[in-house]
UniProtKB/Swiss-Prot annotation:
ARM repeats lie at residues 349-388, 391-430, 434-468, 469-509, 527-566, 576-623, 641-681, 694-733, 734-776, 777-821. The gene is Arvcf. One of its GO terms (cellular component) is nucleus. GO terms for biological process: cell-cell adhesion; mRNA processing; RNA splicing. This is Splicing regulator ARVCF. Component of a ribonucleoprotein complex containing mRNAs and RNA-binding proteins including DDX5, HNRNPH2 and SRSF1 as well as ARVCF. Interacts (via the extreme C-terminus) with FRMPD2 (via the PDZ 2 domain). Interacts with CCDC85B. Keywords: Cell adhesion, Cell junction, Cytoplasm, Methylation, mRNA processing, mRNA splicing, Nucleus, Phosphoprotein, Repeat. The lineage of its organism: Eukaryota, Metazoa, Chordata, Craniata, Vertebrata.
């Protein structure tokens, strides 16, 4: 066995030595041949050495050839050779790969490393393949005119060289790492020749695809056709007749969009060794032009030995021009086909390569008109990348009229083009600048987006469309446009299917749960925005078939799955809150349910007895008999209207059954925006002098909702405290609710008044609107209720109110606090206790001398006269010496809490349709959709109507609709 191994090793060693000897002989033969060819070229150039012997970089021609190095690589790999200038005797280089059938097969291979050690590896080798590189020198026949004949051999620069990686010399142009696969000549130099073949054009080609179509004429091939012409022969061709490839630039690389929400950043798929793409709008195929700062050739490129204006262009193995396939638009340009499988650095990172420059914005926009579909798609994707978080680029795109081009591409027959164009529009529609939104509207962007949503079945396209509409819906003039063109489509294509609601449910099947998809989130956010536009917008949404039903079903599904903190739930609750606004005035047939006075029948019993009877609402011990308890469970004398069929559509908005849904959200959700919207919905439904508001107030008490609301007064979120305080004020119009709230909520209300002066911690500080809302709730509770006034004294509310009047720099806060103090002093039964505590009449008769919000005198037109005091006795009789301050002095109607003039001072509109258009103030969450999208974004400033939830406006009695502010960028990821 050992002898066999020794014999095998010896035979292998002998074979290796034999191969080394062959390569050595081959090397010597090639070197000898190289010298022979160099001498021939030197003799051929001697006649013109005196005038044109200096070429390329200034070196003599013989020296240039002496510097040529033949790089031989290992067997099986390519050989890197350089072409030679054309001489009267044209040379051709070839490489042949052949198999040696005489080489014995072996099952053992030995690899010798550089340090001389030998490693033995057992393999199964059937035959040995070797590569023989040869150089052939042959004469090219010349015609009568002295020009080479076409049939004499392939011209220099043709692609008969097989797999060689060569450098070819071109006339004009620049360092073309990307060459056009085919171009058509203008025909200036060969007017008498036949028309060139019609070669298909391509939007962008890979660097190595260097096939040039042979262009022949009566005079043979012209310069620049892949054949090199000697300097001495160039006079045969007029300089003005030379034709070359278009002096353009390569087309953009293939950019793959990446969703970041409602504004995305798309990164390029460029080659690792290439710079950013240069774009030329006029050509479907073009070479990359030489940068102004130099040619920037590769290190292994040789100096041009023929002409100073020539360029060395690296080529890859060719494909036959006649059989090259057409570019596939869906796969992007051919220039990216060899790179789509791997991600490469972004466009910004390619700037390190000094040879190429990034495309200019006008060039990118011009490519949107390109006849090749992949070019359009790539240009739109690159434009989306440029616009990401760049307001300047967005503004320039509008100024250069790029938005109509993108909108037109939304109806393009190619899905990829539509998708990329919509992605660019999503980023362009996000941001503080509303001019882009207006420009998209002016060029028909909203109808085009709606058409695309109806036709698209690809989920990514639907996300892009709905995200763009979400961004556009933050612009006030666009809200009704979206409703007119897209309400039905958004409802029936997205809201209803994704909510799980079925118009005709199958009794045997289980109800479907809602699907919290990105499309549903974007669509609900868009409807959340448009629902705040005004009375007409609310009417259209209420009457949209299936919308209210689907939203309520989605919320019930969220409560059932205890998934109440996501953005989709927040959007749905905000829509319900907005649609509940002024529901007692705007729904059809509301006049039939109006009441003369608020309150429920049978509430004339004494307040003290009602407080004891209903103490169990807050967990206390009941102090009433079984008969009274049964009467309470039956809503006392409440008589709910009888129905012959189930409520549907907008009727579901004000049914008592929705109270349980809102209370569940208030109990389970930890999303402050959802809490605020749910409390605002109860606030809206409990307002107004109509029968359904009476039922809602009683239902909140029956469903044990008062303790839930009182607990939320401890929230550290200002807007939640404000919404809950106003909801409690509207609920206190029910006398039973007033007694319960006065007994169990007064402590929390007073604590919030103290936080307005000296907050326990920074997050507990309340805004002016919230403080005024709390004070007006206290005023409503203590009015006509001696027991509640006593509760205020026991909670030490008087010192807090007096201090607020004396120290507050807000005239609204001081005035609201003065109203409460005067109401307390009006009860004669309490004056003795107040005087014993050191309070005098002067403390309850304060002048409104407070400063404005920042310490400046208030300019709202208020007088500084002392408010009159109102005396009340236990029976609620009015004093004959003083007039009662009517509720009208506190606001525009019986449910308002702030003077209408004061709201105008703060820049707010009066309650009603005009006030609903007030944009939300204050910081919003950090998302985008203009959150989904610059994903969906930054928090809004006071005047930025960007998307996303934000601080709601101050609500006067009735909850105002939420204007959808900017979406936070945290949701993009």
């Amino acid at each position: 066995m050992e002898d066999c191994n020794v014999h095998s090793a010896a035979s292998i060693l002998a074979s290796v030595k034999e191969q080394e000897a062959r390569f050595e002989r081959l090397t010597r033969a090639l070197e000898q041949e190289r010298r022979h060819v160099a001498l021939q070229l030197e003799r051929a150039q001697q006649p013109g050495m005196s005038s044109g012997g200096m070429v390329g970089s200034g070196q003599p021609l013989p020296m240039a050839w002496q510097q040529l190095v033949l790089q031989e690589q290992s067997p099986g790999s390519q050989a890197s050779l350089a072409t030679m200038p054309e001489a009267p005797e044209v040379l051709e280089e070839t490489v042949t790969v052949e198999e040696d059938p005489g080489t014995p097969t072996s099952h053992v291979s030995i690899v010798t490393s550089e340090d001389g050690t030998t490693r033995r590896t057992e393999t199964k080798v059937t035959k040995t393949v070797k590569t023989v590189t040869t150089r052939t020198v042959r004469q090219v026949p010349l015609g009568p005119d002295g020009l080479p004949l076409l049939d004499g051999g392939p011209p220099l620069g043709s692609f008969a060289d097989g797999p060689l990686d060569r450098h070819y010399v071109l006339r004009g142009g620049g360092p073309a790492a990307t060459l056009s696969r085919a171009y058509l000549s203008s025909g200036g130099g060969f007017p008498d020749g036949p028309e060139p073949r019609d070669i298909p054009s391509y939007g962008s080609l890979s660097r190595g695809l260097g096939v040039r179509p042979p262009r022949t004429g009566l005079l043979g091939p012209g310069p620049g056709d892949g054949c090199f012409t000697l300097p001495g022969r160039r006079e045969a061709f007029p300089m003005g007749s030379e034709s070359g490839p278009p002096s353009g630039r390569s087309l953009p690389e293939h950019f793959q969009a990446e969703p970041y929400g409602l504004e995305d950043d798309t990164r390029s798929l460029a080659a690792d060794d290439e710079g950013g793409p240069d774009l030329e709008p006029d050509y479907s195929t073009a070479t990359r032009r030489r940068p102004e700062y130099g040619r920037g050739l590769r290190a292994r490129a040789l100096e041009d030995t023929a002409d100073d204006t020539g360029e060395l262009v690296e080529e890859r193995p060719p494909f036959p021009a006649a059989t090259a396939p057409l570019a596939q638009p869906e796969r992007g340009s051919l220039g990216s086909l060899d790179r789509v499988v791997r991600r490469s650095p972004s466009v910004d990172s390619t700037r390190k390569e000094p040879r190429w420059r990034d495309p200019e914005l006008p060039e990118v926009l011009a490519m949107l008109r390109h006849p090749v579909d992949p070019v359009k798609a790539n240009a739109a994707a690159y434009l989306q990348h440029l616009c990401f978080e760049n307001e300047g680029i967005k503004r320039r795109v509008r100024q250069l009229r790029g938005l109509p081009l993108l909108v037109a591409l939304l109806d393009h027959p190619r899905a990829e083009v539509r998708r990329r164009a919509c992605g660019a529009l999503r980023n362009l529609s996000y941001g503080r600048d509303a001019d882009n939104k207006a420009a998209i509207r002016d060029c028909g962007g909203v109808p085009a987006l709606v058409r695309l949503l109806r036709a698209a079945r690809d989920n990514e396209v639907r996300e892009l469309v709905t995200g763009t509409l979400w961004n556009l819906s933050s612009y006030e003039p666009l809200k009704m446009v979206i409703i007119d063109h897209g309400l039905q489509t958004l409802t029936h294509e997205v809201i209803v299917p994704h909510s799980g609601w079925e118009r005709e449910p199958n009794e045997d099947s289980k109800p479907r749960d809602a699907e919290w998809t990105t499309v549903f989130k974007n669509t609900s956010g868009c409807l959340r925005n448009v629902s705040s536009d005004g009375a007409e917008a609310r009417r259209r949404l209420r009457e949209c078939e299936g919308l209210v039903d689907a939203l309520l079903h989605a919320l019930q599904s969220a409560v059932g799955r205890k998934d109440t903190d996501n953005k989709s739930v927040e959007n749905c609750v905000c829509i319900m809150r907005n649609l509940s606004y002024h529901v007692h005035k705007e729904v059809p047939g509301a006049d039939r349910y109006q009441e003369v006075e608020p309150g429920i029948p049978g509430s004339a019993a004494t307040s003290q007895r009602r407080r004891k009877d209903d103490a169990s609402c807050f967990g206390g011990k009941k102090a009433k008999g079984k008969k009274d308890a049964e009467a309470d469970r039956n809503f006392d004398t409440l008589d709910l209207p009888k129905r012959t069929e189930a409520a549907k559509g907008f009727e579901l908005l004000y049914q008592p059954e929705v109270v349980r849904l809102y209370l569940s959200l208030l109990t389970e959700s930890r999303n402050f925006n959802t809490l605020e919207a749910a409390a605002g919905a109860l606030q809206n439904l409990s307002a107004g002098n109509w029968m359904w508001a009476t039922y809602i107030r009683a239902t909140v008490r029956k469903e044990r909702g008062l303790p839930v609301l009182v607990e939320l007064l401890q929230s550290e979120t200002d807007k939640v405290v404000r919404a809950v305080a106003i909801a409690l004020r509207n609920l206190s119009l029910d006398q039973r609710n007033k007694d319960l709230i006065g007994s169990y909520a007064m402590t929390e209300l007073v604590r919030n008044v103290r936080n307005a002066q000296a907050p326990a911690h920074p997050s507990a500080h309340l805004e002016e609107d919230t403080v005024v809302a709390v004070l007006n709730t206290i005023h409503e509770i203590v009015s006509d209720s001696l027991d509640n006034a006593r509760s205020l004294l026991q909670a030490r509310g008087v010192p807090a109110l007096v201090a607020l009047v004396a120290s507050s720099q807000s005239v609204r806060e001081a005035k609201a606090a003065s109203h409460v103090l005067q109401t307390v002093w009006s009860y004669k039964e309490l004056r003795g206790a107040l005087q014993r505590d050191g309070w005098t009449k002067a403390h309850f008769q304060s002048a409104s001398t407070a400063k404005g919000p920042k310490g400046t005198p208030n300019s709202g037109g208020f007088d500084d006269s002392t408010l009159p005091l109102v005396d009340k006795n236990l029976d609620g009789e009015k004093s004959t010496t003083r007039d009662v301050i009517p509720m009208d002095t506190l606001g525009p109607d019986g449910y308002s809490t702030v003077d209408r003039r004061e709201r105008r001072t703060l820049g707010s509109d009066s309650i009603g349709d005009s006030s609903e258009k007030e944009l939300l103030k204050g910081p919003g969450p950090a998302v985008c959709s203009s959150d989904h999208m610059e994903v969906i974004g930054r928090g809004p400033s006071g005047t930025d109507p960007v998307l996303g939830p934000g601080a709601p406006p101050f609500c006067v009695g009735l909850a105002k609709p939420l204007v959808y502010l900017a979406l936070p960028s945290s949701l993009l990821s």
